[in-house]
């Protein structure tokens, strides 16, 4: 008799995706982040659901409802901080996952890569709207500044902003709709993640060497289930340490001040995971130019497969490209630091240089390095 997991309509799908899936025998810990992102997403949906049971999306009570969750609800504080710091872990895993894709040339799976970019945008939108919900100073002013950027769009900009706001400023209507979208989008992300996996399983996983691994596959279970559990335990360890020892480490103290439309905080800045894009936005003096640069800083990932000029897939055997990749990582860390600094003399220039370098590496230097490496192979 055939095993039920291979015949049952539902079990069959799970079996082909997570149990009998043929996987390359040499994938490293950099391939753990997909499953970690799945864990993060489930954690965020569950903690978010319990928070939504006690949260009220009204400007007069939103701030106090979050305080009520932390003070009066049983284990409300841990749910709230798991959700807030879970978002940080989510983005750490996301950026590692994208970095892995860039380094090992996984972007040659174009469909999977493009769905991944859509996923990235959706998660960023979800996180942004979630940051508005506690209705603190940074929530309110962050929402005001970022939504206001759409007014840079010629002709329809102002109408578009007022349509999103539901009025002439960020107010009750804005908060209510942001809560509605923040609730629904994680399920959209879940559906997109399923499509992401669907496309990935059409081709099979990439591997560090970048060459086909069809001749050397091993079953996903038990080899990679065990490996993924190790990654998951490390993720949970880091998250637990964050939540229990320094839950506000990655947050902004200004968000403990209730939103006040009449007083602007000295430094308006988003959560740490958006700072690199925020730095790119601020480095261009023109409003529309800044908005375009902001969108392109992520959308540029869609152009990466078109600029792949190397004869090799990954960067494992390409030293020049490796140097450029790590320069890109350092550049992104610099941009993240600049995004959190005030708009003053040394920071403005550093931000502009780092922004130029970011686009230069991806659009110009990487393709040139690949051509040079191709020629080195001939010698």
Curated annotation (Swiss-Prot):
Subcellular location: Mitochondrion inner membrane
Chain positions recorded as heme b b562 binding sites: 83, 182
Binding annotation for a ubiquinone: 201
Membrane topology: Multi-pass membrane protein
Transmembrane helix recorded as keyword: yes
CDD domains registered for this protein in UniProt: cytochrome_b_C, Cytochrome_b_N
Cellular-component GO terms for this entry: mitochondrial inner membrane; respiratory chain complex III
Pfam families, A to Z: Cytochrom_B_C (PF00032), Cytochrome_B (PF00033)
Principal cellular location given in the protein's record: mitochondrion
InterPro entries: Cyt_b/b6_C, Cyt_b/b6_C_sf, Cyt_b/b6_N, Cytb/b6-like_sf, Cytochrome_b, Cytochrome_b_C_euk/bac, Cytochrome_b_N_euk/bac, Di-haem_cyt_TM
Coiled-coil region(s): none
GO MF annotation terms: metal ion binding; ubiquinol-cytochrome-c reductase activity
Cofactor binding mode and count: Binds 2 heme b groups non-covalently.
Parts of the chain that traverse the membrane: 33-53, 77-98, 113-133, 178-198, 226-246, 288-308, 320-340, 347-367
Listed GO biological process terms: mitochondrial electron transport, ubiquinol to cytochrome c
Known cofactor(s): heme b
Residues the entry annotates as binding heme b b566: 97, 196
Miscellaneous notes: Heme 1 (or BL or b562) is low-potential and absorbs at about 562 nm, and heme 2 (or BH or b566) is high-potential and absorbs at about 566 nm.
Family, per entry: Belongs to the cytochrome b family.
Functional summary from the UniProt entry: Component of the ubiquinol-cytochrome c reductase complex (complex III or cytochrome b-c1 complex) that is part of the mitochondrial respiratory chain. The b-c1 complex mediates electron transfer from ubiquinol to cytochrome c. Contributes to the generation of a proton gradient across the mitochondrial membrane that is then used for ATP synthesis.
Subunit structure: The cytochrome bc1 complex contains 11 subunits: 3 respiratory subunits (MT-CYB, CYC1 and UQCRFS1), 2 core proteins (UQCRC1 and UQCRC2) and 6 low-molecular weight proteins (UQCRH/QCR6, UQCRB/QCR7, UQCRQ/QCR8, UQCR10/QCR9, UQCR11/QCR10 and a cleavage product of UQCRFS1). This cytochrome bc1 complex then forms a dimer.
Name under which the protein is recorded: Cytochrome b
Organism: Pusa sibirica (Baikal seal)
């Amino acid at each position: 008799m055939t095993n039920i997991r291979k015949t049952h309509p539902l079990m069959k799908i799970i079996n082909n995706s997570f149990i009998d899936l043929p996987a390359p025998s040499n994938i490293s810990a950099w391939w753990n982040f997909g499953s970690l992102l799945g864990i993060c997403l489930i954690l965020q949906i569950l903690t978010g659901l319990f928070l939504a049971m006690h949260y009220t999306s009204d400007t007069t009570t939103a701030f106090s409802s979050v305080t009520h969750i932390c003070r009066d609800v049983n284990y409300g504080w841990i749910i709230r901080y798991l959700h807030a710091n879970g978002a940080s872990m989510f983005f750490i895993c996301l950026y590692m996952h994208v970095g892995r894709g860039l380094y090992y040339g996984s972007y040659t799976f174009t469909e999977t890569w493009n769905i991944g970019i859509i996923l990235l945008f959706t998660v960023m939108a979800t996180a942004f709207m979630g940051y508005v919900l506690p209705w603190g100073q940074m929530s309110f002013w962050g929402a005001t500044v970022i939504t206001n950027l759409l007014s840079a769009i010629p002709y329809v900009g102002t109408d578009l902003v007022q349509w999103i706001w539901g009025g002439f400023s960020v107010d009750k209507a804005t908060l209510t709709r942001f809560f509605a979208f923040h609730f629904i989008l994680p399920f959209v992300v879940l559906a997109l993640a399923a499509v992401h996996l669907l496309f990935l399983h059409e081709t099979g996983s990439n591997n560090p060497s970048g060459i086909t691994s069809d001749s050397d596959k091993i079953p996903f279970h038990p080899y990679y289930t065990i490996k993924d559990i190790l990654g998951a335990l490390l993720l949970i360890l880091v998250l637990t340490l964050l939540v229990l020892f320094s839950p506000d480490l990655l947050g902004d103290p200004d968000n403990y001040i209730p939103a006040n439309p009449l007083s602007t905080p000295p430094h308006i800045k988003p959560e740490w995971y958006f700072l690199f894009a925020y730095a790119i936005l601020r480095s261009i003096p023109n409003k529309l130019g800044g908005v375009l640069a902001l969108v392109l800083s992520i959308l540029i990932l869609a152009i990466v497969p078109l600029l792949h000029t190397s004869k090799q897939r990954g960067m494992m055997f390409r030293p020049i490209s490796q140097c450029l990749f790590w320069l890109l990582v350092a550049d992104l860390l610099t941009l993240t630091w600049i995004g959190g600094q005030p708009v003053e003399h040394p920071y403005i220039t550093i931000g502009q240089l780092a922004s130029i370098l970011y686009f230069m590496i991806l659009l110009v230097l990487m393709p040139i390095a690949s051509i040079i490496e191709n020629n080195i192979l001939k010698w």
